Amino acid sequence: MPDTKFHFSPRPNRAHEIQWREWSDDAFREAQESGKPVLLSLSAVWCHWCHVMDETSYSDEGVIGFINQHFIPIRVDNDQRPDVNARYNMGGWPTTAFLTPEGEILAGATYVPPDQMKELLPKVNVHYQSNRNEVTNKALELRQRRLTAMSGERGELSPRIFDDILRSVVENYDPVFGGFGEAPKFPHTDAIDLLLYAYRRNRDPDLLHMARKTLDFMSRGDVFDQEWGGFFRYATRRDWSEPHYEKMLEDNAKLLPNLLALARITNHQSPLSRASGDEPGVRDFADRTFDYVEWKLRDKEKGFFYGSQDADEEFYKLSKEGRERAEEPYIDRTCYVSWNAMMISAYLEASWTLDRPELRDAGQRALEFLWDECRDAQRGMYRFHDGSGPQVLGLLGDQAHTAKALLDAHEVTGESMYLERARELARFIVERFADRENGARTGGRSAGFYDVWDQVEDVGRLKDRQKSIQDNTVCAEVFLRLHHLTREDKSREIARATLEAFVSGYPHMGYFAAGYARQVDTLLNPPAEVNIVGSAALAAELHRAALALDVPSRVVQVLDPARDAARLEALSLPAEPAPAAYACFGTMCSAPVTQPEALAETVRQMQQAAVRPAAAT
């Protein structure tokens, strides 16, 4: 029987006959004691070519026998161990990597057909067995070179960073089909978000057009499931056709905020002006995506979201009626914490953007599952929950995205409990993930946060902690928002130091650093800060007006005088009049605003005085 610790292709295969080990100290110790190299397979439950490799190369009797005799085979699920994937991925999935017993890379590829695999396996084995000392010494040399390359210098933040990255987004925009680059076409949601952010900064219609056209071609094209709703992972052609049909919770969670932001900017009209009459608009595509997630990817009993639905080209080409008669693609019912946190944030944003309060309730319920079932009180958030319990501690992304979702919940619901939980996670991030050598732990000039905590696994490349610009960008957002919510200067300094750590590296990333650009600009140009004083019931209209402000960025919270007296005092806000909103940009604050319709104009006037123009395109 197949080992249930591993997921193999749902179609007939013999991959389970390979004596797979989990990623562990024991597996590498076995390799060292036996003198055998390691075969590392990085796979994913949704990955079509991973399934093909299970059915072909890993089902070949000769391949199975040779691997079991001459290698220590280790199988890792990409979604469960993104830290391993970040260090060993060879350019896609499946990844087929050959390692020394110390965990350094000998050779690697992605999908390897059976005939090539039969040639490759003995070549790698002979090379390693014949050159062990040379291979080991070279591995040590490569590790030292890698560590030197990772120790980049910090730099000063300046408006040029935002301008450089926005220019890269614009230069890589595809004017024919939208999106960025040619083929394959990925959504690049951070780049779309930066276009919409920059448009709200300077009202350049070209920036809005690029975002609208990208989302329009995606929503009306093959990369959107026109029958069920929801987006496939990417398209293999420039015109968004011939998609890879896996549906990922993560990808849909990232695309939904793009659609919601565009819906607000265009007042829920169609992404492009060419649509008219009964053609669906941006709200329709957002609604249909949420409906798909509710239908197929949410656990109705426990409240969390599933990880993905498998790719099956023939199934997704069927009509609704045809799909009802066919076997449905596999759904990975694992709860991945960071992806759940992303979708929770999207649900909370949609609850007021689309006026769907049931999405707020569902988002809060999922957030409670993460906090209650996927967290250790002393050791932070786990990576995933597979039904048997939470698994894998110590990854930065899960802490950062959960903290962000908690701040989103605080902003949308007004409940201070979420703010306190976010502060708790933020303290844990500083304590366990900060680059201590550069002072992040004490709030000094730091080099950001590592992707894994300080309880490092002494296995392979996991011995060397890395810094992800994406995860650090989320951390910077969390600390910057905490600063505006609490007026604690230390949080702002941590955010600044985190962003400074990537000043020397961002030029090499181009538009892939779009999320970083937004947070740099938000730090240099203060967001609209709106504190609403009054009970949730009395302040509801002011709260809604604050959430809907048409500004590049804003921080909103509701403070109930009966519950939040200490915080009102810390923020130097009076308990009366109530309800009333106080809008601030930096040190400039408004008089109390008591009429919801007056809040937008008050903020607009203050914004004009506070924010510099974005770079022209």
Residue ranges, per PLM feature:
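Glycan-recognition and catalytic cores of secretory/periplasmic carbohydrate-active enzymes
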Residues: P2-R14, S41-S43, H48, V52-I64, ...
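Conserved alpha/beta-hydrolase
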Residues: P73-V76
